[in-house]
Amino acid sequence: MIQLTKFNPPTLEENLRPVGLTDDTMAQRRQELLDKMTQDNFDCLIIYADLEHGSNFEYLTGFLPRFEEALLVLHKDGKAYLVLGNENLNKADKARLKAEAVHMPHLSLPNQPMNTQETVEEILSQCDLEHTQKIGLVGWKNFTSTKEDNYQLFDLPHFLVHAVQSLCPKAILENATRLFIGENGVRTTNNANEFAHYEFGAALAGRCMLNAMNQIELGKSEMEVARELSDLGQAHNVVTIMATGERFVKANIYPNDKVIKKGDKLSLTTGYKGGLQSRGGYAVSQVSDLPDEEKDYLSAVAKPYFNAVKTWLEAIKIGMQGQELYNKIEEVLPQEKYGWTLNPGHLSADEEWMSSPVYPQSTESIGSGMLFQIDIIPSVSGYGGVSCESGIFLADAQLRQEIKEAYPDIWGRVQERRAYIQNELGITLRDEILPTSSATAYLRPFMLDKTLAFTVK
């Protein structure tokens, strides 16, 4: 039974430190992608990046082009070219793979110097593309339409696609993002080093969320609370949310100076590489503080939702098909009644939502090394929302041992989180479930009472 009771909140984790990706990890990434290219008969990949859509590029290069655009051209023999704008050209020799720099000022900011007499096509000709027979274009989206040829949907800027088509008129062009984030894509699983790398951001998001929830008080502004949702100078991978009362007034999506009032609906979100934390509830401390027409919020929305989170955590396991997890959530939280529409769980990495093996009729296998977000979003008419979106990592016995040996401090944090979730929240976890933050599954629906949270009795 789901109960709202008083107990100690999770520990605020200190001494969080970033873990860099090793040279061995970067070499492994490159080789696994080259193997995928061979399997699918690609002569080369052209991988696009901008700040928001650059994770496939960053996966191999180690950096994002910030305010510019960029291309990585990777041939099946391992030869690589970095096509860069004015202010990223100096990053080529800093990249995590050996690549020849090619300057394309067209990728720079508007009105910056265009000191070239060459067209986009002529610049791309420096990347040894003319004799390729099959080219994979990689943006950020693995299309899954049932009505179109997904291999012919390209999410790169037209000026680049057009130049490739003109330069290589006889080549087959395909969307190849699937090699990265589709079923069995190279980015869908992580080694011990990658887990440690991503755990830092996920843990930081959890700490930020716990600190922010502790700052919620009547009369405080959204901005005052939102100050806690950023930390250590780290870049967010989602828009920070701290909203009280009605949302999206005059289309605003950012925290502002609106103050918290009793009975307000509250929404908070923060995220970094490796994981996001989101919370939804009310600015109340007890049922009697809720608006009259919403006094059954706990039984109508919040408790069924938390039961779905419990079910998700207790059901997910290595080797199950995505549809099995999807059906479990549909069983305990029917879409028709609770209004959720998206995948109840997705993979995370540098970006908050990378892809998802969890969907109707999915035969994709959930595997060791997958970094998951518990993302279930009910929408019940007449009530505010509820959320405790957070993350876990799946690791088989061998991967767990590798993490324990290489990163004992992180392993210790993980064990403390597991103990809290099982002993305080009452949720049973398989050995393969590694919570990525101390806030995972912790939910205070009445946010003015900082001692009340859901548990399973």
Tell where the protein language model's regions lie, with residue ranges:
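Active-site neighborhoods and metal-handling regions in enzymes and metal-associated proteins
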Residues: 1-457
